[in-house]
């Protein structure tokens, strides 16, 4: 089994949306891949729509990703702008994609 973390860099994701994203991701991946949606720890923005919000969410994303990386084989940043992707690639020992 390949375990993939889908990291949501914002905070305050409703549980039903988390479940929806997880369900859709797992429907779209092969059977040997398991995707788990993880929300970054705060403080941080609810949505990321500006350069300020991109930077604001990066520290929480890095803290969360560093703490959980041993549980996963890869990490996907669940945000269109891929906030913090370069820093996360430096920090983690697992592949990071946007």
Please identify what each model-predicted range represents.
Residues 1-59:
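N-terminal glycine-rich anion-binding loop in soluble enzyme alpha/beta folds
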Residues 14, 85-86:
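Glycine/Thr-rich phosphate-binding loops of Rossmann-like dinucleotide-binding domains
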Residues 18, 87-90:
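Short amphipathic alpha-helical segments
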Residues 28, 86-87:
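Short hydrophobic alpha-helices and adjacent helix-cap/hinge residues
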Residues 31-33, 72-73, 94:
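Short, well-ordered coil/turn segments that N-cap beta-strands
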Residues 51, 55-71, 84:
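Short, well-structured alpha-helical segments in soluble
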Residues 73-79:
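Periplasmic-binding protein-like
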Residues 89-98:
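Short, acidic/small-residue loops that bind anionic groups at enzyme active sites
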